[in-house]
Amino acid sequence: MIQLNKILVPTDFSDFGKPAIAYACAIAARFEAELHLLNVVPDQAMLVPEVAAFSPESMQAQSESLVREAQRQLAVLPGDDWENGKAIVRQVRTGPAAIEIIEYAKAENIDLIVIGTHGRSGLMHILMGSVAESVVRNAPCPVLTVKPEGHQFVTL
């Protein structure tokens, strides 16, 4: 029988990620698994092409501000979806999202990653890439992708 002890939900706090959190909570409750919520703050160099124009102190302050905001938002998740008595692990990392998600999954021995998709296709997908796709291709464990639209998950 499959046993899931640790479930990871990477989130960017967008509406696209909310269904993934609901799915992960339901699965975690079913398996009495520990839930890991992860937000990855992009590296400053990834956010601002003119990064050389900013002082290191300014960049550090901005990065710290983004991390604090991410921690604040993680603190209220998963909200009412969580009915399991198990612990919730909340983590913020900085760097490229897909790489940080995969490294976290390896380091924490995650059994399942549940990740939302943005539903981009065509040119937008080519230009912007897909964190979910990269995670699916490189994760050390199974990955469940959850589309933002479609079937609603109902717990019984």
PLM features: what roles do these ranges have?
Residues 1-2, 30, 76-113, 150-156:
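Structural beta-alpha unit
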Residues 2-56, 87, 151:
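Small/aliphatic-rich secondary-structure junction motif
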Residues 3, 103-154:
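Gly/Ser-rich helix-loop-strand patches that form or flank binding pockets
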Residues 20, 47-50, 102-103, 126-127, ...:
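Short, well-ordered secondary-structure micro-motifs
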Residues 38, 89-93, 144:
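General small-molecule cofactor/ligand-binding pocket signal
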Residues 56-72:
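A short acidic, glycine-rich active-site loop
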Residues 69, 92-96, 118-119:
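Short beta->alpha linker loops
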